[in-house]
Swiss-Prot record:
Residues 93-120 are annotated as: Required for interaction with thrombospondins, THBS1 and THBS2. Residues 2-7, 462-472 are cytoplasmic. The lineage of its organism: Eukaryota, Metazoa, Chordata, Craniata, Vertebrata. Pfam families: CD36 (PF01130). Its main location: membrane. It comes from Bos taurus (Bovine). There is a cross-link at residue 469 (Glycyl lysine isopeptide (Lys-Gly) (interchain with G-Cter in ubiquitin)). This is Platelet glycoprotein 4.
Length: 472
């Protein structure tokens, strides 16, 4: 009888040890299986989960616009007063709903090339008004004239066309005209072969961004989705040194197994440069753990604050010898037009940027850019890209519409918020196919290890106690 009991206790201890060992072995083996599966499914080729969502995003992406409506145009034109603006919006468009085109795999370089077609559909139910709403805004053509034609003789000639067209420093335009283009009356009179249609995003509809060539990750998963070339080049020709390089992905996804210490680099054609995001917080998005990466203030810092930005300073006067921060001159990639990009309301910008503009109120929560990235797959499941489009206007003695200005203005035209969040159906699918299976495997590992250890200890204690009793 004693033998049977001892044998049973020993058998229980052995079973517990086996369970514990199996649970311990399952941890690295399970992690290896997960890694192998993820590496297979994030490759950009036919048949993978990543490829299906990469060709055409399953997430609804919206671009909201807020327009800075100028309230005192005459005061500014005559007296060079502060510009009083009233923010109006949001006006919402659905974007990025078209599938990638001309997708071509290159098995030799392990890359895939494509075009991303552009399109925008107005969403009245998500907007405060219609595309026909009218705003008083800076006259884009008149403001650009002194920058494009610094020669005073040329400015005198242009002034005659400006006067004849009855153009001034400010103009009234509908939302549709401002965003997507209108025939400018001043430019229409210029007898040179120039583009007479102008708009903040003109041309956009029926155009395409690219050609992009990105690594498909088949030979090296750490390079998946990273851009190899853009429009056939590895650099942009807008900046000097390393600032001109095209780095990272397009921010829709990143190589898998993202760590908090990683700096996520991505390229944005909207701002004509590569940029980066750093870890901010852990967040739960529809039951999926994600890492929030934020665009740091250092990204638009002056070279004095962040020496790495020295090659983004392209001139010394407007930038006040490269000390101005929070704004980026992208004129070189806008055909020389004096276009400046910043965060909305000059968030993280030099105080002198907002000083000549009334009614700006920068807010970190509303105006910062972030990416919510699922760390195992590297997929971006939610994002908010926020930026402001500004235009420089300078005094010009030979142009009557600008001759009374006493100083330069970097005038905010509009700011946008482009957002996308994984839908409920896609989130459930993601939980079932990825996070759910990983969590289940982790639970099985812990249960096996815990139960095995408890069984082994309990049966061994019982066995030792039984033997001690027999000896006594």
């Amino acid at each position: 009888m004693g033998c049977n009991r001892n044998c049973g206790l020993i058998a229980g201890a052995v079973i517990g040890a086996v369970l514990a060992v199996f649970g311990g072995i399952l941890m690295p083996v399970g992690d290896m299986l997960i890694e192998k599966t993820i590496k297979k499914e994030v490759v950009l080729e036919e048949g993978t989960i990543a490829f299906k969502n990469w060709v055409k995003t399953g997430t609804d992406v919206y671009r909201q616009f807020w327009i800075f409506d100028v309230q005192n145009p005459d005061e500014v034109t005559v007296n060079s007063s502060k510009i009083k603006v009233k923010q109006r919006g949001p006006y919402t468009y659905r974007v990025r709903y078209l599938a990638k085109e001309n997708i071509t795999q290159d098995p030799e370089t392990h890359t895939v090339s494509f075009l991303q077609p552009n399109g925008a559909i107005f969403e009245p139910s998500l907007s405060v008004g219609t595309e026909d709403d009218t705003f008083t805004i800076l006259n884009l053509a008149v403001a650009a004239a002194p920058q494009l034609y610094p020669n005073t003789f040329m400015q005198g000639i242009l002034n005659s066309f400006i006067k004849k067209s009855k153009s001034s420093m400010f103009q009234n335009r509908t939302l549709k005209e401002l965003l997507w283009g209108y025939t400018d009356p001043f430019l229409n009179l210029v007898p040179y072969p120039i583009t007479t249609t102008i708009g903040v995003f003109y041309p956009y509809n029926n155009t395409a961004d690219g050609i992009y060539k990105v690594f498909n990750g088949k030979d090296d998963i750490s390079k998946v989705a990273i851009i190899d070339t853009y429009k056939g080049r590895k650099n942009l020709s807008y900046w000097s040194s390393y600032c001109d390089l095209i780095n990272g992905t397009d921010a829709a996804s990143f190589p898998p197994f993202v760590e908090k210490t990683r700096v996520l680099q991505f390229f944005s054609s909207d701002i004509c440069r590569s940029i980066y995001a750093v870890f901010g917080a852990e967040i739960n998005l529809k039951g999926i753990p994600v890492y929030r990466f934020i665009l740091p203030s250092f990204a638009f810092a002056s070279p004095f604050q962040n020496p790495d930005n020295h090659c983004f300073c392209t001139e010394k006067i407007i930038s006040k010898n490269c000390t101005l921060y929070g704004v980026l001159d992208i004129g070189k990639c806008k055909e020389g037009k004096p276009v400046y990009i910043s965060l909305p309301h000059f968030l993280h910008g030099s105080p002198e940027l907002a000083e000549p503009i009334e009614s700006l109120s920068p807010n970190e929560e509303e105006h910062s850019t972030y990416l919510d990235v699922e760390p195992i797959t590297g997929f971006t499941l939610r994002f908010a890209k926020r930026l402001q489009v500004n235009m420089l206007v300078k005094p010009a003695k030979k142009i009557e519409a600008l001759k009374n200005l006493k100083h330069n203005y970097i005038v905010p035209i509009l700011w946008l918020n482009e957002t996308g969040t994984i839908g409920d159906e896609k989130a459930e699918m993601f939980r079932n196919q990825v996070t759910g299976k990983i969590n289940l495997l982790g639970l099985v590992e812990i249960v096996l290890l815990s139960v095995g250890v408890v069984m082994f200890i309990a049966f061994m204690i019982s066995y030792c106690a039984c033997r001690s009793k027999r000896v006594n």
